Amino acid sequence: MFQRRKLFSRASAMVALSTAFVAGWFKSDARAQGGYTVNQQAMIDLFQKHVDAEMKGDLETTMATMNDNPHLNHVPTMAGGVGREGVRAFYRDHLVGKFFPPDVKMASISRTVGDTQVVEELAISFTHTTAIDWLLPGVAPTGKSVEMAVAVIVGFKDGKISHEHIYWDQAGVLVQVGLLDPKGLPVSGAESARKVVDPTLPARKI
């Protein structure tokens, strides 16, 4: 059985990301809306702990939330790791404490909770002032503003996180940092993410 929670519907719902915000966004929605099973709430709480540890740069706690054979895949760039050592090495070298530049803002658009996974739909914005290895590997900071819609699929097995699959529109990101010219191509930039936040914005004319 799946439960979907609509959390924010307008760009005005965007809030500045902080450790306190990340630590609270999962619990606050579930408790406000109600209706999650004990197992579903346990998955939400564990993922909350996982993200909070990532933002704090706490590698040991991050890994403690994962099972014995996890995998992590940032789908557009194929960045991540397989197995505890592979995932641990990726977190240590490229992610924990290096997630986003300091001005990042994040809003949860929706959440879908099943029996073995949580799917979080997010709108994220930031200025590309630091290297972001998982998103733009090998690309030096451009100073450009970026807005992106992100879907995070988190799997659970035996009470721990078994995998994370993270999806976003990489073409849109490349357009915004100046690495892809959208002229003549069926791609969009920041407006694509904005329409996820506000579905009433005009669709592309075809």
Where are these regions (language model features)?
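C-terminal and inter-domain tail/linker signature
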Residues: 2, 10-18, 25, 31-206
